[in-house]
């Protein structure tokens, strides 16, 4: 893996193998039995799956030395966010080409269809 030492790669591969074994140790239950029995099996399977998810996250964070989730993106306050159709209307990739729409009417991405 680019930019890291081989020792870290070996640790990461070992962690991935362990996580794979954990997930393989919890197969989904067979669909037989009464409705209540199936529901209980699914509930227990889901609980085990959640435990495996948290254990896997802990293994990866200890192996990588950082949380698996990226740092959340800082967004401006909601009051400053707006959609203004007069600035750019559809046609991504062609911004700044042609005449801008300045009419007071809303943009039409799809034209009015005719029913036959």
Swiss-Prot record:
Post-translational modification summary for this protein: Asymmetrically arginine dimethylated at one site by host PRMT6. Methylation impairs the RNA-binding activity and export of viral RNA from the nucleus to the cytoplasm.
Modified residue annotations for Phosphoserine: 5, 92
Gene3D superfamilies: 6.10.140.630
GO MF, any single term: RNA binding
GO cellular component terms, semicolon-separated: host cell cytoplasm; host cell nucleolus
Cellular localization per UniProt: Host nucleus, Host nucleolus; Host cytoplasm
Skewed-composition ranges (Basic residues): 36-47
Superkingdom of origin organism: Viruses
GO biological process, alphabetically ordered: mRNA transport; viral process
Alphabetic keyword roster: AIDS, Host cytoplasm, Host nucleus, Host-virus interaction, Methylation, mRNA transport, Phosphoprotein, RNA-binding, Transport
Region (Homomultimerization) location: 18-26
Name of one Pfam family that matches: REV
Positions occupied by motif Nuclear export signal and binding to XPO1: 73-84
Segments for region (Disordered): 26-48
Chief location category: host cell
Motif annotated as Nuclear localization signal and RNA-binding (RRE), chain positions: 34-50
Domain notes: The RNA-binding motif binds to the RRE, a 240 bp stem-and-loop structure present in incompletely spliced viral pre-mRNAs. This region also contains the NLS which mediates nuclear localization via KPNB1 binding and, when the N-terminal sequence is present, nucleolar targeting. These overlapping functions prevent Rev bound to RRE from undesirable return to the nucleus. When Rev binds the RRE, the NLS becomes masked while the NES remains accessible. The leucine-rich NES mediates binding to human XPO1.
Family (UniProt): Belongs to the HIV-1 REV protein family.
Additional comment: HIV-1 lineages are divided in three main groups, M (for Major), O (for Outlier), and N (for New, or Non-M, Non-O). The vast majority of strains found worldwide belong to the group M. Group O seems to be endemic to and largely confined to Cameroon and neighboring countries in West Central Africa, where these viruses represent a small minority of HIV-1 strains. The group N is represented by a limited number of isolates from Cameroonian persons. The group M is further subdivided in 9 clades or subtypes (A to D, F to H, J and K).
Subunit text: Homomultimer; when bound to the RRE. Multimeric assembly is essential for activity and may involve XPO1. Binds to human KPNB1, XPO1, TNPO1, RANBP5 and IPO7. Interacts with the viral Integrase. Interacts with human KHDRBS1. Interacts with human NAP1; this interaction decreases Rev multimerization and stimulates its activity. Interacts with human DEAD-box helicases DDX3 and DDX24; these interactions may serve for viral RNA export to the cytoplasm and packaging, respectively.
Purpose: Escorts unspliced or incompletely spliced viral pre-mRNAs (late transcripts) out of the nucleus of infected cells. These pre-mRNAs carry a recognition sequence called Rev responsive element (RRE) located in the env gene, that is not present in fully spliced viral mRNAs (early transcripts). This function is essential since most viral proteins are translated from unspliced or partially spliced pre-mRNAs which cannot exit the nucleus by the pathway used by fully processed cellular mRNAs. Rev itself is translated from a fully spliced mRNA that readily exits the nucleus.
Protein name per the record: Protein Rev
Record organism: Human immunodeficiency virus type 1 group M subtype J (isolate SE9173)
């Amino acid at each position: 893996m680019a930019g890291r030492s081989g020792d870290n790669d070996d640790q990461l591969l070992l962690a991935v193998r362990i996580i794979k074994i954990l997930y393989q140790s919890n197969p989904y239950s067979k669909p037989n039995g009464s409705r209540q029995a199936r529901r209980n099996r699914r509930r227990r399977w889901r609980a085990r799956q959640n435990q495996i998810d948290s254990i896997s996250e802990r293994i990866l964070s200890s192996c990588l030395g950082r949380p698996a989730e990226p740092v959340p993106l800082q967004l401006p306050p909601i009051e400053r966010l707006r959609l203004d159709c007069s600035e750019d209307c559809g046609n991504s990739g062609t911004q700044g080409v042609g005449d801008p729409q300045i009419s007071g009417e809303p943009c039409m991405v799809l034209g009015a269809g005719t029913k036959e």
